[in-house]
Design a protein with these regions (language model features):
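Histidine- and aromatic-rich ligand-binding microenvironments
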Residues: 10, 25-26, 86-87, 157-159, ...
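Short secondary-structure transition/capping segments
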Residues: 21-24, 35-36, 81-82, 93, ...
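Bateman/CBS regulatory modules and CBS-like beta-alpha motifs in cytosolic regions of diverse proteins
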Residues: 6, 11-13, 17-21, 31-60, ...
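A conserved regulatory-domain signal marking ACT and ACT-like small-molecule sensing domains
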Residues: 91, 101-194
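Short, structured interface segments
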Residues: 26-30, 75, 79-94
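N-terminal, positively charged regions that mediate nucleic acid binding
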Residues: 1-5
Length: 194
């Protein structure tokens, strides 16, 4: 458990899932010769089915503060587990984190939430939305929409959003290329000094 940084361990009897044990309870066991099934530990009966949606898995991790979620088939046979690292990698792929591009965060009214209109604005600038998600806030009528765009140069898209009265809350470009503007600026300054 320590090697993989796991704080929970699924307990199984062949393929039968018995429950989820916490690291704390397992560490309290003094006799290392006793089988885990014979230890006086309380087991969580938490699991997810193999066809569950990722949101269900995220909910279990969040609500129960788990480091792993056991995965069972429809006959409740143990198939494996999802670790927090697996979940993070899957979520990174889901939100196109590793794809090049920029991020635009919009603040909008919850009554004016039209993803199709936002998509039209982005596509009118010859770009595509790679991923999007919406955050809501308690006691607020505002939503925060985060758009991952397949371009790093976002000024035209931002101008279009502002033209349609969208509030641009933040812009993040993960551009690693140099467009040569610093070289041109330095050349211009050298020219002026001559």
């Amino acid at each position: 458990m320590n090697e993989f940084k796991l704080y929970h361990l699924p307990i199984v009897n062949e393929t039968q899932y018995l429950g989820l044990a916490s690291e704390e309870e397992l560490m309290e066991a003094r006799d290392m010769e006793i089988a885990i099934g014979a230890l006086p530990i309380s087991l969580l009966s938490t699991f997810t089915f193999e066809n569950a949606h990722i949101y269900e898995v995220i909910r279990l991790f969040s609500e129960l503060q788990l480091s792993v979620v056991p995965v069972l088939d429809q006959q409740k046979n143990y198939l494996g587990l999802v670790s927090i690292n697996h979940l993070l990698n899957y979520t990174a792929n889901l939100y196109a984190v590793n794809e090049p591009g920029g991020i635009i965060v919009l603040s909008i009214s919850n009554r004016n939430n039209s993803l199709s209109h936002m998509s039209q604005i982005v596509e009118a600038e010859n770009a595509q939305i790679l991923s999007s998600y919406v955050s809501s806030f308690p006691d607020s009528t505002r939503l925060e929409v985060t758009l991952k765009i397949n371009k790093t140069e976002l000024s035209a898209i931002i101008a279009s959003f502002e033209r349609y009265d969208y509030e641009v809350k933040g812009v993040f470009n993960n551009s690693s290329h140099d467009d040569g503007s610093m070289d041109r600026f330095n050349s211009f300054m050298n020219y002026l000094n001559v």
